[in-house]
């Protein structure tokens, strides 16, 4: 299980009006791909959506017992921005460890529009690969993408999606990213009032989504978001493994 956007499948200031999104592969995108060109962004790096707040300096730590060992993910909101498709986005660093060894280091880009929707605009990815003795042998960048570009040379242009809607309602279905053949994560809102209990005994009332992608048709994930905190848990449907929030700072 890979946790990110954040937990994806193994997430200048001033008034900005977005220009047209380039066509994807010469065809139209599905209806579930949000219309980025119709959004406006007055303060895009001020991300205060209650289910996906990004306050600079906040760090979330998640853990999961997996078949491969202990997985730990550290998510940090950086005091950095990046311009994507003419919009400034907030940079979120996500580091994933397996048995205390760094296996992935990403920088995700998010922006909030004037309606309160949080957009996912892409990510830089460093994947760390080791030999059986634990020696680093290569760093790859599989999974990297940027809205408005074709970074993998696939002949298509990536489009941004919603990582969290402003007013989510059960049944809402939307793409979180749309880069044909490379990144096509989708989500559907299942419920707004699901109570979950973490291993440490903490209870949260959560927004629940079911995440999926046609690139991995046999996999479904449930994610749970608490107001004022963000993501608190993720699980693969049919698996006993669950990624859980263990700390949030400050």
Which residues are covered by each model-predicted region?
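Bacterial N-terminal signal peptides that target proteins for export
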Residues: 1-8
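Sec-dependent N-terminal signal peptides of Gram-positive bacterial secreted proteins and lipoproteins
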Residues: 12-15
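C-terminal motif of bacterial Sec signal peptides marking the signal peptidase cleavage site
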Residues: 17-19
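Conserved functional acidic sites
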Residues: 21-250
